[in-house]
UniProtKB/Swiss-Prot annotation:
Pathway: Cofactor biosynthesis; 7,8-dihydroneopterin triphosphate biosynthesis; 7,8-dihydroneopterin triphosphate from GTP: step 1/1. Pfam families: GCHY-1. It catalyses: GTP + H2O = 7,8-dihydroneopterin 3'-triphosphate + formate + H(+). It comes from Thermosipho melanesiensis (strain DSM 12029 / CIP 104789 / BI429). The lineage of its organism: Bacteria, Thermotogati, Thermotogota, Thermotogae, Thermotogales. The record marks C145 as: May be catalytically important. This is GTP cyclohydrolase FolE2. It comes from the Bacteria. Its EC number is 3.5.4.16. GO terms for molecular function: GTP cyclohydrolase I activity.
Length: 259
């Protein structure tokens, strides 16, 4: 059959990334406590396309991923990138993979266990000049406004916030380690299941520990900077303000801290 993708293209324009996006696929990932966890990932995979090829072979991306989906870890992702480059005759390959990750969490007072969902994943690139690998977590937390507490006779506005941490490491850093740093740096963590004694504890703890998004970002940055396994990091904190129709945002990475 005629291979249309391999036809010669005369426009002389190379493409940086071609591939597939938003592929949903069952995967197994490493879990610090239970060794392995089954989940469903959202996956983007790309390669470069030379100027003289009309198109890439999209089906081959899934053929490659299908070999490795039962064990997603840093070593496997490196193999996926190598296989993509070899199979598609490319100079570079990139993968972005994110998935729900569940941890058992005890309520602070009653100690009742329930599962808490986090968004975790990896982003990796392998090219002629450089290789990059990032571990990513997104963690929902609570912030309570220090200014609101200071100027109010009682109470203060509080809300959920989303923390996103990306790290480049010299050795394995568990998702759980990054999740703990994010939750420890907030006014208070979130919980799936709270009874009345737990709710009282969480409400009072947040009030006693007010944080701006700037405070959360800086406190996380200090913890990451002090971790010898982490070579580079980026932190983003977005607070879904309960008394405004806009969000508050703060961002820091290790590069700016070196200046």
């Amino acid at each position: 059959m005629k291979d249309v993708q391999s036809e010669k293209d005369t426009r002389e324009i190379p493409l940086k990334h071609v591939g597939i996006k938003k592929l949903k696929y069952p995967v197994q990932v490493l879990d610090r406590e239970n060794k392995v966890q089954n989940t469903v990932a959202d996956i983007n995979m790309y390669v470069d396309l030379p100027k003289d090829f009309r198109g890439t072979h999209m089906s081959r991306f899934l053929e490659v991923f299908n070999k490795f989906h039962l064990k997603i870890d840093p070593k496997t992702i490196k193999k996926i990138l190598d296989d993509l480059k070899q199979t598609l005759k490319a100079q570079s390959a990139k993968i972005e993979i994110m998935f729900p990750y569940f941890l058992k969490k005890k309520a602070p007072v009653t100690k009742i266990e329930s599962y808490m969902e986090y968004l975790c994943g990896f982003s990796a690139y392998d090219g002629p000049q450089k290789c990059e690998f990032y571990t990513i977590v997104e963690v929902s937390v609570q912030t309570l406004c220090p200014c609101s507490k200071e100027i109010s006779k009682y109470n203060a506005h509080n809300q959920r916030a989303n923390v996103r941490i990306e790290v480049e490491t010299s050795e394995l850093v568990w998702f759980e380690e990054l999740i703990e740093i994010a939750e420890d740096s907030a006014s208070v963590p979130l919980f799936s299941l709270l009874k009345r004694p737990d709710e009282k504890f969480v409400t009072e703890k947040a009030y006693e520990n007010p944080k701006f998004v700037e405070d959360v970002a800086r406190d996380i940055a200090i913890r990451l900077k002090d971790n010898p396994k982490i070579n580079w990091f980026k932190v983003e904190v977005e607070s879904y303000e309960s008394i405004h129709n806009h969000n508050a945002f703060a961002c820091v990475d290790s590069t700016i801290m070196e200046v």
